[in-house]
Design a protein with these regions (language model features):
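Hydrophobic membrane-insertion alpha-helices, especially the h-region
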Residues: 1-4
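Low-complexity, Ser/Pro/Gly/Ala/Val-rich intrinsically disordered tracts
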Residues: 6-34, 40
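GH16 jelly-roll
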Residues: 36-295
Length: 295
């Protein structure tokens, strides 16, 4: 497989296989700030310019960067199936979804990851069945995880009833909860869900919010999460959209999931209708993680 991972800082992340990266990042990648003040976010300071915070925090160092530059997905960093507690199979979640996860729907084109959702008949084996839709997903489980820091993607979300793309984090240790939904788009409702699931199964709790003030569909935007002990900030295009504080904020290493999906009638985006466009694509230009130097 061609290598499409652009670099890591040793010691800042877990689960990265040595010898598979094409470059090593040294020093810090920080935003350029002219003037401004500093405010505290946990133990870290964040630059403020014109009333807007600048992410990542200035002293954070780039720990992980994936730009999907190769012709094929780097299997040393990404899987295309998802084994999560409570799922009905590695390639099918539950009856909130209509799609089966297919490797054919994970594409790298023009320097972007393109996760396709398609209306086609698929015979699956995990679990067995015939599915009317397929879609693509990548997961860094057992390959890359991190505990605290700032994670960001630049992405373009598809639209249409039943369309259900998501950028989320799950715990490396197979348990569930917790879960971070950094940017989960309910396209049928034109709503971006910003969620945190916590508790002890089966007693789970959702700490959720949503916003509808960004042109999500067909436009490139950045989506990020600043995660520090006891605090999380959801950020879109450099603007904080919500905050969670308290002991329910996850404290365990988490891995990255990027997925496109098709909602059933009981799912949050509703079932597809005649106006839903297939194929549709959840496109990602990059995934980056920054961490404080002491991590």
């Amino acid at each position: 497989m061609a290598v499409c991972f652009s670099g890591v800082l040793s010691g800042a992340v877990t689960g990265v296989v040595s010898g598979v990266v094409s470059g090593v990042v040294s020093g810090a990648e920080a935003p350029s700030v002219v003037g401004g003040d500093l405010v505290e976010a946990g133990r870290q300071s964040i630059a403020v310019r014109g009333g807007a915070q600048v992410f990542p925090p200035m002293e954070y160092q780039l720990a992980f960067e994936e730009r999907f530059a190769g012709p094929e997905l780097n299997r040393d960093l990404w899987s295309t199936s998802l084994r999560v507690f409570g799922r009905w199979g590695d390639r099918y979640h539950n009856d909130s979804y209509l799609n089966y996860l297919s490797d054919e729907d994970v594409l790298l084109e023009n320097g972007h990851l393109r996760l396709r959702a398609e209306h086609r008949s698929v015979e699956g084996d995990n679990p067995p069945g015939v599915y009317d839709y397929s879609s693509g997903m990548v997961s860094s489980h057992d390959k890359f995880s991190f505990q605290y820091g700032y994670i960001e993607i630049r992405a373009k979300f598809p639209g249409g009833r039943g369309v259900w793309p998501c950028f989320w984090l799950m715990p490396q240790g197979h348990q569930w909860p917790p879960e971070f939904d950094i940017a989960e788009y309910y396209a049928g409702r034109r709503m971006m869900h910003l969620g945190l699931c916590h508790g002890d199964f089966p007693e789970i709790n959702w700490d959720s919010d949503a916003n509808e003030d960004v042109d999500f569909e067909g436009a490139w935007n950045t989506y990020g999460l600043l995660w520090t002990p006891g605090r999380a900030l959801w950020i879109q295009n450099g603007v904080v959209k919500r905050e969670a504080k308290g002991s329910h904020v996850p404290s365990v290493p988490m891995y990255v999931i990027l997925s496109n999906g098709v909602s059933s009638k009981i799912g949050p985006s509703g079932a597809p209708d005649a106006q839903t466009k297939f194929p549709n694509y959840f496109e990602v230009e990059y995934v980056k993680v920054w961490q404080a130097p002491d991590k």
